[in-house]
C-alpha cells in the first residue's frame, strides 16, 4: 500500500492530523491496533481552547458544561474557578474519539485495524509493517500516545518510570452529593471528579514518577469516592500506566 502519510494512532491527535492533511489534499492511512468505538481511560474534559480547534461542533457529544471548577490542595486550601461560558465541556472519550474517527474517514482517510510491528526508512521514504500489511509512505506521524509504539520502534527509549492511575464511574443517582468538576491533590498525587449527564468520572493517580511515592490502588479510589461523594458504588474500574520519558526523545529523521 502506498500513500502520502501514514498516521499511527486513531485517537484525537491522529484524527486531527488526518483532518488537516485531507484538507490539504494528501492521501492518508491511519493505523490503530484497536477498532472503534473502544474504551479509553480519560476524564473527558475539553477546554474552550481545544474546542475552538476542532473541525466540528461538539454539541451532540457534550455531557455537561462545567462553569465551576474546584481545586483542593494538600494544605487544606481550596480555589474556585467560575466561568459563565464554561471552564470545560465534558464528553465521554469513547464517544468523542469514535465521532472524530468517523469524521476523518468520511473525509477520505483510510483505516487499517492492525498492530505495527516494524518501521524502517530508505531513500524513497518510510516503510511500515503491520501484522498483515506493508505500507510505504513519504512521511510517518506517530500519534499513539504517551506509551507510543512508534517511539519504541524507532528509538532505543525505554519506558522505565511510568506513573499510574485508576479510573471509575459513579452513577449520579448513587451519589449523596451534587459535586462540580473537582481536582483534589493528595499524598499519591491527585484525584478528580468530572460530572457527566448520568454519572461522575472519578480517578486517582500519580502526578510525577517518584520511587518514594506509593502507586495508587483501587481501594484508594474507593476511599476517595466515599469521602467526596458519600458513596461506595464504584463501577467500570480501569487501571493504566502512563509513560513519562517522552520529553527525552527528539526525532532523528525528517520523515518521522
List the model feature ranges, each with a label.
Residues 147-222:
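Conserved FAD-binding catalytic core of PHBH/FMO-like flavoproteins
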Residues 19-41:
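Glycine-rich FAD pyrophosphate-binding loop
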Residues 1-13:
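Beta1/beta-strand and adjacent pyrophosphate-binding region of the FAD-binding site
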Residues 52, 56-59, 65, 70-153, ...:
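Conserved N-terminal helical subregion
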Residues 118, 210-256:
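FAD/FMN-dependent oxidoreductases across multiple families
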Residues 5, 26-28, 140:
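Hydrophobic anchor at the start of a short beta-strand
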Residues 4, 138, 255:
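Conserved acidic residues
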Residues 34-57:
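Conserved N-terminal glycine-rich FAD pyrophosphate-binding loop of Rossmann-like flavoproteins
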Amino acid at each position: 500500500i502506498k500513500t502520502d502519510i501514514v498516521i499511527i494512532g486513531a485517537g484525537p491527535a491522529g484524527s486531527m492530523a488526518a483532518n488537516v492533511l485531507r484538507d490539504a489534499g494528501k492521501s492518508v492511512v491511519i493505523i490503530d491496533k484497536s477498532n472503534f468505538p473502544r474504551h479509553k481511560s480519560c476524564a473527558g474534559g475539553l477546554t474552550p481552547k481545544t474546542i475552538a480547534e476542532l473541525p466540528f461542533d461538539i454539541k451532540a457529544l457534550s455531557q455537561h458544561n462545567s462553569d465551576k471548577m474546584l481545586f483542593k490542595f494538600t494544605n487544606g486550601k481550596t480555589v474556585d474557578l467560575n466561568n459563565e461560558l464554561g471552564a470545560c465541556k465534558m464528553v465521554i472519550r469513547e464517544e468523542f474519539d469514535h465521532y472524530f474517527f468517523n469524521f476523518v474517514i468520511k473525509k477520505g482517510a483510510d483505516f487499517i485495524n492492525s498492530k505495527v510491528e516494524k518501521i524502517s526508512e530508505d531513500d524513497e521514504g518510510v516503510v511500515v509493517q503491520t501484522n498483515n500489511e506493508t505500507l510505504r509512505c513519504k512521511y510517518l506521524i506517530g500519534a499513539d500516545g504517551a506509551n507510543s509504539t512508534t517511539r519504541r520502534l524507532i528509538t532505543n527509549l525505554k519506558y522505565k518510570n511510568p506513573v499510574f492511575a485508576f479510573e471509575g464511574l459513579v452513577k449520579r443517582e448513587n451519589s449523596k452529593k451534587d459535586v462540580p468538576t473537582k481536582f483534589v491533590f493528595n499524598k499519591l498525587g491527585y484525584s478528580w471528579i468530572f460530572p457527566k449527564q448520568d454519572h461522575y468520572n472519578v480517578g486517582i493517580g500519580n502526578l510525577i514518577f517518584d520511587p518514594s511515592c506509593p502507586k495508587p490502588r483501587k481501594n484508594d479510589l474507593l476511599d476517595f469516592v466515599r469521602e467526596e461523594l458519600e458513596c461506595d458504588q464504584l463501577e467500570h474500574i480501569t487501571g493504566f500506566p502512563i509513560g513519562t520519558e517522552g520529553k527525552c526523545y527528539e526525532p532523528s529523521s525528517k520523515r518521522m
